[in-house]
């Protein structure tokens, strides 16, 4: 909301044109067959599903990141296309570096909750594209 985005009611998003429109977001909605914590419609009209994950140990990070968020990212890319969705994770806590690299290789863009400037900068960078 601090970027000027408006929250809209959650709905099931079955095609790339459904769901929040440019400058809007919704919480807890289905994108395809998988639930996303937040879905943002970027200024360039791509969808950015964001998974919020907290891990208290590097062992736990496999479950949170690789077995959940990265699997969802792969599904979303397969269903909607790599040019139409930007799957992301907003992370807090302890994560194994190898698990982070594997998640990125699966198509997940990673941001950290302790520093929200990069995700805000990315979202703003889609303006005028």
Question: What spans do the regions from the language model cover?
Answer:
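Catalytic core segments in nucleotide and nucleic-acid processing enzymes
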Residues: 4-129
């Amino acid at each position: 909301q601090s970027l000027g985005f408006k929250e809209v009611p959650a709905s099931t998003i079955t095609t790339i044109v459904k769901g929040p429109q440019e400058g809007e977001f919704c919480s807890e909605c289905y994108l395809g067959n998988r639930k996303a914590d937040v879905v943002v419609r970027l200024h360039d009209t791509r969808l950015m599903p964001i998974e919020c994950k907290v891990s208290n140990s590097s062992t736990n990070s496999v479950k949170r990141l690789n077995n959940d968020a990265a699997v969802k990212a792969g599904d979303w890319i397969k269903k909607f296309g790599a040019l139409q969705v930007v799957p992301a994770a907003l992370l807090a806590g302890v994560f194994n570096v190898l698990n982070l690299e594997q998640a990125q290789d699966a198509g997940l863009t990673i941001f950290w909750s302790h520093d929200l400037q990069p995700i805000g900068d990315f979202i703003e960078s889609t303006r005028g594209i």
